[in-house]
Amino acid sequence: MAGEFVNLYSKWRGINRFPALLMMFDLLAEWDAPMARGISLPDVPNLRHWAQTETKLGNPALKAYCAAHSIDEMPDMHQALEWSVAVNKSVEEVVQGGLPPFPYVRECLEKAQALADMMVCSQTPGEALEREWAEQDMDKYVFTINGQEVGTKSEHIQFASDGRYDRTKILMIGDANGDLKAARNNQALFFPINPGEEEASWKRLFDEGLDRFFAGTYAGDYEASLIAEFEKFLPTTPPWKK
């Protein structure tokens, strides 16, 4: 439940898996019910330091770190790598054959393609992103697919836009607070996909959001109203603390 809260039902949804893992440990440590049952949480000081200092939080960087440090030196790092590799394998098995996108996703991409350059910004491993977008024949709509190995979402936008686009002509579409922060860090606009109401959000983007963006009437009250609604879907307090 702590993992689901962090990754799906809180303002931290969409963050990189390693900070999310650490946050889950911290929430469990403060939760009386599981602690009363004698749960033993792993001691991960090296992983904490790495997650705070590494700029490309992904398996390639973690593999390089583990190659330079033995399992006796850094047992938590080697365990984290084993876990992360297993996560990738599990995801590949779960989505084998392809999970179709929400209704109106493809329609939005087709509508925007004629007027915009589009790319993927994600903290999912790049290999999984490329495979899943290709399985749905949606990679043809974007000029690049950026995963966790490339850097943060803010860096993805910065790398692609610096010196190329006016900031008022950049729109980040996302379902997490990290997506909103990435947009704001680059003075870009943001269209929220509300968690749990994805289909309605994509329909709104198709029906009105894209038209407003391309017409130059998106910024201001319209965007602010969408973000105010979006933030209500992202609590900071887990349900067991209420």
Model feature map: region roles:
Residues Q96-D117, T124-K242:
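C-terminal cap/substrate-recognition subdomain and adjoining C-terminal extension
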Residues M1-E127:
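Alpha-helical substrate-recognition element adjacent to the catalytic core
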